[in-house]
């Protein structure tokens, strides 16, 4: 009996590993090259490309909480995930047939709507599972980082051989395969014992949850905006497009080992201490870029993304789920993701563009550093709130 349970645990973990690898392989193969496709193949202007690329974070602000509510209300997150994975892959496939700018805008909005459900619901299911079996979320999630890193090289090479259209075909095939795998993920369901509206309202009335949303905005906003501006920074200080690819590979690849040790560090040092450490290192990285160091040193500092993302994501997700009532956990994770991936990403991307137009790309990173350090400061406030609660003050 014990052996059977152990084998089942191994099989479920293998499914999770394969699932996360596929999802991030698809994302890593499409989005880093999408702007190149729109510019070089479709011949859209820089402004048009910028508008299309900025649609996703705006849509996510509204769509991610909606999918969380749907998942919690139906109590069928696995079915919701299978459906949205399939729709995301199909919409991505249709990109390859389009040449009109306005159709691209519509497709980008639809793609973002379905895609916005993938990571929050997947993470919620994974966290629910590892908490039940006393497992390690980081050892599962790191395969997403590996999938992204491998995809940057593999799909980039395929694009050179077969043309940039291949990014949509790979994206569609991989996400459909992930949809099939999602069927075998463990079920996550809770008995609804309060009205959902009351549950969501209770989340927004929790001072610690609201403060953590602000922290997520300040820390994750610059991290996601960096995906848009880092290539400009590299080329501005003398790097090449190949160098940009190497930098993204190093950054994404560095997340995996830190995700592997994240659970052990969280248990040893505590969630909030890990959040402070990862946010502080992220802030130092952005401030360091403000002084425009030599290119070789910039490449070396990409490993800081392992600290900032590889440690912050597991600790933040666990904190949100532990904080939220059981019946609205997916909603809580979705709101958290919408604030970081959506609102924070949009604000920092938009604000960064204004700063870039008036000053320089180095100044953009200086602003990112200041925002992140404010986020780090608020984590100290959150830690103090936790300590006061424990001491009964």
Regions found by a protein language model. Give the residues of each.
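Structural signature of the two symmetry-related core transmembrane helices
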Residues: 79-93, 273-287, 369
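Hydrophobic core of transmembrane alpha-helices in multi-pass small-molecule transporters
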Residues: 21, 91, 101-119, 217, ...
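Cytoplasmic helix-loop-helix junction between adjacent transmembrane helices
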Residues: 109-143
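Helix-loop boundary and gating motifs at the non-cytosolic
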Residues: 7-57, 209-247
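Conserved MFS/SLC helix-loop-helix module at the cytosolic interface between two early adjacent transmembrane helices
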Residues: 62-96
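Helix-to-loop junctions at the C-terminal end of transmembrane segments
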Residues: 62-75, 159-160, 257-270, 356-357
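Symmetry-related core transmembrane helices of the 12-TM Major Facilitator Superfamily/SLC fold
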Residues: 166-183, 363-382
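Juxtamembrane intracellular "pre-TM" segments in multi-pass secondary transporters
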Residues: 2-10, 182-216
């Amino acid at each position: 009996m014990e052996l059977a349970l152990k084998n089942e645990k191994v099989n479920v973990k293998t499914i999770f590993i394969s699932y996360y690898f596929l999802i991030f392989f698809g994302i890593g193969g499409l989005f880093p090259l999408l702007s190149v496709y729109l510019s070089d193949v479709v011949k859209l202007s820089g402004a048009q490309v910028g508008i299309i690329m900025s649609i996703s974070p705006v849509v996510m602000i509204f769509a991610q909480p909606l999918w969380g509510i749907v998942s919690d209300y139906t109590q069928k997150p696995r079915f919701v995930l299978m459906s949205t994975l399939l729709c995301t892959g199909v919409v991505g496939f249709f990109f390859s047939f389009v040449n009109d700018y306005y159709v691209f805008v519509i497709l980008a909005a639809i793609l973002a709507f379905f895609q916005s459900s993938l990571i929050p619901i997947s993470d919620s299911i994974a966290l629910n599972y590892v908490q039940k079996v006393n497992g390690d979320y980081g050892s599962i999630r790191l395969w997403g980082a590996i999938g992204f890193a491998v995809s940057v090289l593999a799909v980039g090479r395929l694009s050179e051989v077969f043309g940039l259209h291949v990014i949509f075909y790979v994206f569609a095939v991989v996400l459909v395969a992930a949809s099939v795998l999602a069927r075998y993920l463990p079920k996550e369901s809770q008995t609804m014992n309060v009205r959902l509206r009351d549950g969501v309202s209770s989340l927004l009335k929790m001072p610690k949850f609201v403060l953590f949303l602000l922290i997520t905005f300040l820390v994750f906003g610059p991290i996601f905006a960096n995906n848009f501006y880092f290539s400009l920074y590299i080329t501005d200080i003398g790097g090449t497009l190949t160098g940009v690819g190497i930098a993204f590979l190093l950054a994404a690849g560095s997340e995996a080992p830190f995700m592997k040790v994240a659970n052990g560090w969280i248990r040893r040092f505590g969630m909030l201490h890990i959040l402070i450490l990862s946010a502080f290192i992220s802030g130092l990285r952005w401030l360091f870029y403000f002084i425009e160091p030599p290119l070789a040193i910039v490449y070396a500092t990409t490993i800081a993304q392992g600290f900032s993302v590889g440690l912050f994501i597991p600790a933040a997700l666990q904190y949100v789920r532990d904080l939220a009532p059981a019946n609205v956990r997916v909603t809580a994770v979705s709101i958290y993701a919408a604030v970081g991936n959506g609102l924070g990403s949009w604000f920092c991307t938009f604000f960064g563009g204004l700063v870039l137009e008036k000053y320089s790309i180095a100044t953009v990173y200086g602003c990112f550093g200041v925002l992140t350090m404010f986020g780090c400061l608020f984590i100290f406030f959150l830690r103090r709130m936790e300590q006061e609660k424990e001491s009964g003050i």
